[in-house]
Every structure is written in structure tokens, then in C-alpha cells.
Amino acid sequence: MLTKEFAQRVELSEKQVRKIVQHLEERGYQLSKTEYRGREATDFKEEDIELFKDIADKVKQTNSYDLAFDELEKEKDFLQVIVKNDDKNLPTNQNVAQLVEDLRLEIQKMREERHLLGQMMNQVHQQQQELKELQNQLTSKIDSNSESLKAIQTSQEAIQEAQASQAKVLAESTNKVEKNAVTEDKADSKDSKVAGVNTSTDAKTDTKADNAGDGTTTKVDKEDQISATEAIEKASVEQSKNGNAAETSNKEATIDAEAQHDAEQQVAEAHAEASKQATSNDSLEAKAENDSTASQSEMSEPKPQEEKKGFFARLFNL
């Protein structure tokens, strides 16, 4: 029977039948041939129906013609299944052993190739795993670098904030120092005024002592000088206190106002003391002039020397 009729018998398409015939002929199996419309065609027999059905079932299971034929070769002897009982198609006794050996070698070669293919697939799978690991490592490194960059940016911002705060503190310190310098200049000017007052007081005392012209006025002059010297020393002490207060105000800016108030109060006290001394000097000058007049009129009558009086005794006429 021809291909179309045989395909209907085995319930396959003509294309599938031709494909099976091609694989059988490539493996050295020969089917019966006939001539149809001037061309050679396969002449299928009744016994071929079972063979083609078995091959079609294996192809469906393996989804491959090559694998189907390999399994069928293991299950049964194809030489006895598909070789026809035709003497012209049977090999000679001399070639049977060689043919079987060739087939065995071919099958072994195919198995080796399949094993190599499996190894190559395993290598490819292993390389894919390595590539995934490398990708994960790169991702982790990128993440760590990103975190490092964020940390660096944060530290830079902190440094900038610290620099800004330091500059602010420095500016405030500079302003405080300038204020303290102004306060110190004011204290120095006030101290110089006090020194001027003391100097004028000393000048008045010296002038009045020169006008007295006798021993009594000289004693008064010395005592006045001692009192003036004490006032000057007191003013110097007050000035040094003012200087110390100014220096302390440079270190402790919060007590500048109190130190300045104390310095002004001390200067006022020194000025009041100087005024008292000037007043007492004027009274002593008047008394010395009276004593000088009395001594000139009574030069011929010596009098016993009176007891030396102190500054405060003379001041209160004791």
C-alpha cells in the first residue's frame, strides 16, 4: 500500500509517516519499494503497521525521534523487527557480526556525546550560579559605598555646623573683648582725673606751707604732705583695684557693670577725701598765719614749746 493509505491505517499524518521512514533509512533499515507514476515509492506491508505504531507512541512519550529510536533499540532487536523476510535484503553471514559491531560503536559514541552534552550543561549552570553570586557581591558593595557616601556627607555637614558655631562664638568673644577694652579705657581716664585732683591738692598744700614762713607752718606742711601722700597711695591702691577689676572683666564679661560701678564709687570717695583735705589745709593755713603774726609780736617773750599735735587734733582744735 502507498503512503496515503498506510497513514490512514496507522492513524498518522503523511508527514509523520515520511519522517519515520527517513529516520529508519538513515539508521540503515530498508523498506520495500515500488514504482508509482514513474517515481519510486515505499510499498508498506501489513506487518509494518505495528512497527510504525510503536515508533509513533515512543515519539509522543519522548517528544523526539532520536530518543524514541534509541529506546526502541534497547527494548528489542530492530534487525528482526523491520528487516523483511526477503533474501535480497538480508545481510550475508560474513557481514552480520561487523554490522552489529558498527551499530554498537555508533550507539556508544552517541552516549558519550550525550554525556559530554550533559557536562556542558552542568558547566553552564555552574557559571550562571557564579554570575549570580558576583552580581550579589557587586550589589552589596554598591550599597556599602552608598552608605559610606551618606556617612561622609553627614560628617561634612556636622563639620560645617561646628565651624559656623565656632565662628559665632569667636565673634561674640571679640565683641566682649572690645567692650572690656572700652570699659578699661573709661576706668583709666577716671583714674587720671583722680591723680590730677591729688596733684592739685599737693600743689596747694606746698604753696600754703611756703607762705607760712616759720617752724610751725613747716611742721604743718610735713603733716599735710604725709596726709596727701596717704591720699595718693590710697588713690593708687584704688587705681590698681580698678585695673584688676578691668582685667577680671576681660575674663568674666558678666560682672563688667558691677566692677565699673565699684570703680566709680571708689573714685568718688577719693575725690571727697581730697576735698576734705583741701578744706582742712585752708583752715590750717589761716591758723598758721595767725600764729606767725603772734610769734613776731612776742619775739622777746619766749614761751614754753607746746606739745606737738597731730593732723586730726589740729583739725578739730584739740
UniProtKB/Swiss-Prot annotation:
The annotated regions of Basic and acidic residues compositional bias extend over 175-193, 219-236, 249-274, 300-310
User: What are the entry keywords?
Assistant: Coiled coil
Coiled coil stretches, renumbered:
67-157
Composition-biased stretches, type Polar residues, lie in 237-248
Region entry Disordered, spans: 172-318
> What protein does this entry describe?
Uncharacterized protein MW0361
